[in-house]
Amino acid sequence: MPFPVPDPFVWDTSFQVFYFKLDDQHRAIFETLFNSTNDNTPGNLQLFYIVTANHFEEEEGWMVSASYGGYDAHKKLHEEFLAKVRSFSAPVSKENLFYAKDWLVQHIKTIDFKYKQLL
C-alpha cells in the first residue's frame, strides 16, 4: 500500500534514514520541490533537479563504499527519476508535481529504508 504524500509537502521524521547527511539532503529535496510547487518557475525546477541529482550521486557513493547489494537497482531508479524530471518544463503540471512528490515519498519509505543500518 502506498504511503500518503504529505500536504503541505514537508519533510518530517517519518522519512529519517538515520544518516544525518542523507536526512538533511532529503529535507532539502522536499524543500526545493515544495518551493517549485508554490513558485512554479524554471529556476525552482532547475534547483530541484540539481539538489536531487547531487543527493543521488552522494547516496550512490555511500552505497558503493559500503558494497551495498541493492546498488545497481537503486541507481537505475535514480536515473529513471532524473530522466523524467528532465522532461518537465516550467510551469510544471500538477500531475508532474504530484508524480515527483509521490515518487520521492515511496522511494524514501520503501527503497531508501532498505539501506538503514547498512551504509
Swiss-Prot record:
> Which Pfam families does the record associate with it?
Hemerythrin (PF01814)
Highest rank taxon of the organism = Eukaryota
Q: Which UniProt keywords apply?
A: Iron, Metal-binding, Oxygen transport, Transport
Q: Where, by residue number, does Fe cation 2 bind?
A: E59, H74, H78, H107, D112
InterPro entries the record matches: Haemerythrin, Haemerythrin_Fe_BS, Hemerythrin, Hemerythrin-like, Hemerythrin-like_sf, Hemerythrin_metal-bd
> Where do the annotations place Fe cation 1 binding?
H26, H55, E59, D112
Q: Which GO terms describe its molecular function?
A: iron ion binding; oxygen carrier activity
- Indicate yes or no for the key word Chloroplast: no
What the protein does? Hemerythrin is a respiratory protein in blood cells of certain marine worms. The oxygen-binding site in each chain contains two iron atoms.
Tell me its family: Belongs to the hemerythrin family.
Can you say what this protein is called? Hemerythrin subunit B
Lineage of origin: Eukaryota, Metazoa, Spiralia, Lophotrochozoa, Annelida
